[in-house]
A protein has these predicted regions:
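N-terminal Rossmann-like NAD(P) cofactor-binding subdomain of oxidoreductases
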Residues: 1-199, 229, 272-276, 283, ...
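Charged docking surfaces used in two-component/phosphorelay signaling
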Residues: 180-334
Length: 334
């Protein structure tokens, strides 16, 4: 069976990734492309500044863009699912209107921390999808909203999940985040050349709060946040794609570096068990070289869906430290 999907915010960087990953997908067919009112009524190829490394599919280029409202989308085609890449400042009410009738999978931050909305990383917390039933009953919707975490949170929690068996207590993370994470046109060249920007608005708070929800337990229809402490510092660096994070963790148990490497290598999630089409064979890849991972060499591992970990060491202050890298607009966004 193939499901028809609408992509909201299709002309942006995340919307383009949705198109790239859903075009020719065995389960989904792109039925409707929606964007802003100024783009509506025009062909996608004329209004989209395509920034990805692959060519824009000709069939997609010829599709007519519609406005991002339920009436316009329904008029353009019959849909089963909605993928939302809308900016967070407008996503909230628009997604809620669609969710009254359709399943909505959102990249925006608008609904991430709502108590009845799953904040989902499929390898980490698939059981949180139980919230969908509660959400539909509470809001009297036929559809629902499931949210996707911040790009820098996703790769972090994928690496933290296998460490929870050792008793996770504290996490300190410092990020070096790629330019594409700021969207297009993004950061001005004069601001980033020969420079590092030591502040990304709202990013640290997202990591600290989202991590607790994702790693929390579903109990009696509510998420009980994980009882760990998370501290984040975020920086924008002059790299096109691929977020690199320095992670320091305190564990309850005394573990060796080899214990941690083995936990990373053996980690599999529900997508791997089900052999889902977009799931990487290995959600975490361990590199042994002293100077890896690096964005240029490692961001496309697992077709951009794997998290690459390296420099795993004992830490003199906490327990273990390591670096992790992931493609921020593939695993991290779409």
């Amino acid at each position: 069976m193939v499901w028809n999907v609408a992509i909201l915010g299709a002309t942006g960087v995340v919307g383009q990734r949705f198109i790239q990953l859903l075009y020719n997908h065995p389960w989904f067919k792109i039925e409707v492309l929606a964007a802003s009112e100024k783009s509506a009524g025009k062909s996608f190829g004329k209004v989209c500044n395509w920034t990805l490394e692959s060519e824009m599919p000709r069939e997609v280029a010829e599709m007519q863009v519609v406005n991002s409202d339920v009436k316009s989308v329904e008029k353009a085609g019959n849909i089963d699912f909605v993928f939302s890449a809308l900016p967070s400042e407008i996503a909230g009410p628009v997604e809620e209107e669609f969710a009254k009738k359709y399943p909505v999978f959102s990249k925006a931050s608008s609904h991430r921390l709502e108590e009845d909305a799953p904040l989902l990383v499929p390898e980490v917390n698939p059981e949180h999808l139980e919230l969908v039933k509660i959400q539909k009953e509470r809001r009297n919707w036929d559809g629902f909203i499931s949210t996707d975490p911040n790009c820098s949170t996703i790769q972090l929690v994928i690496t933290l999940k296998p460490l929870m068996q050792f008793g996770l207590k504290k996490v300190i993370v410092s990020t070096m985040q790629a330019l594409s994470g700021a969207g297009f046109p993004g950061v001005s060249s004069l601001s980033i050349i020969d420079n590092v920007l030591p502040y990304i608005s709202g990013e640290e708070e997202k990591i600290e709060l989202e991590t607790l929800k994702i790693l929390g337990n579903l109990d009696d229809g509510k998420i009980q946040p994980a009882s760990i402490k998370v501290s984040a510092s975020c920086n924008r660096v002059n790299v096109k794609d691929g977020h690199l994070e320095c992670v320091f963790v305190e564990l309850e148990r005394s573990v060796s570096v080899e214990d941690v490497k083995e936990a990373f290598r053996n980690f599999k999630g529900e997508p791997q068990t089900l052999k889902l089409p977009s799931a990487p064979e290995n959600p975490i890849i361990v590199r042994e070289e002293e100077d890896r991972p690096q964005p240029r060499f490692d961001r496309n591992e697992g077709k951009g869906m794997s998290v690459v970990v390296g420099r795993i060491r004992r830490d003199n202050v906490l327990t273990i430290k390591y670096l992790c890298l992931s493609h921020n607009t593939i695993r991290g966004a779409a």
